[in-house]
Design a protein with these regions (language model features):
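Acetyl-CoA-dependent GNAT
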Residues: 100-102
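Bacterial N-terminal signal peptides that target proteins for export
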Residues: 1-10
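Sec-dependent signal peptide cleavage junction
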Residues: 17-28
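Bacterial N-terminal signal peptides
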Residues: 9-19
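A cross-family detector of function-defining hotspots
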Residues: 40-97, 116-181
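N-terminal periplasmic "start-of-domain" segments of outer-membrane beta-barrel proteins
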Residues: 105, 109-113
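Second-shell loop/turn segments in exported
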Residues: 29-35, 114-121
Length: 181
């Protein structure tokens, strides 16, 4: 009886080991897109990409307080969202690529493909590239629309990095979203 229990525990450990290894490999340094990290100031982003074009403002509740939200388009389908604090405007989200399924038909521009994560993943990278760069491919979260868009999400301590692919239109990544948890 004890041998059977021990054998079951060993098999379970072997099954769970790849998931644990994958999660352990994602660091806070990996949580960047195009050189932008969660928490960077607006001035730091503008050093990299210029002033950009402001396109939206809003209000959000953060830590029980109403805070300002500011969104800027930096071209090449790069959009950054900031939250105001007593220290100024700080990055809470970076989005690169397309949101619309129809736009998945078009090839990303060379400029937008030049923006990448610290592990070299960019628009048009494939699922195989993700698995090679991050050591595993997480279970996809797929939309219910047709054709489905699947997100492959890697979690850090304070942020998540998600890669979106619509396999019916292209094997490559069409959108990347870095956001705080």
């Amino acid at each position: 009886m004890k041998i059977k229990s021990l054998l079951c525990a060993a098999i379970l450990a072997l099954i769970l080991l790849p998931a644990a290894l994958c999660a352990a490999e994602i660091t806070e340094e990996d949580m960047a897109l195009g050189g932008i990290h969660i928490g960077d100031t607006r001035a730091e982003v503008e050093e990299l990409y210029g002033n950009g074009n402001h396109y939206a403002d809003g209000v959000d509740v953060w830590n029980g307080e109403d805070v300002g939200i500011h969104a800027i388009d930096y071209g090449a389908s790069l959009h950054v969202t900031y939250r105001s604090s007593d220290r100024g405007w700080h990055v809470i989200s970076v989005h690169l690529g397309v949101d619309d399924v129809n736009a998945y038909l078009s090839k990303p521009s060379e400029e937008s493909q030049s923006l990448e994560t610290p592990r070299g993943i960019h628009l048009d990278s494939t699922k195989e590239d993700l698995a090679k760069a991050y050591g595993c491919l997480p279970k996809p979260k797929c939309s219910n629309n047709a054709p489905p868009i699947c997100g492959y999400c890697y979690d850090g301590e304070t942020a998540q990095l998600a890669f979106y692919i619509c396999a019916e239109h292209s094997p490559g990544i069409r959108a990347i979203w870095l956001h705080e948890k």
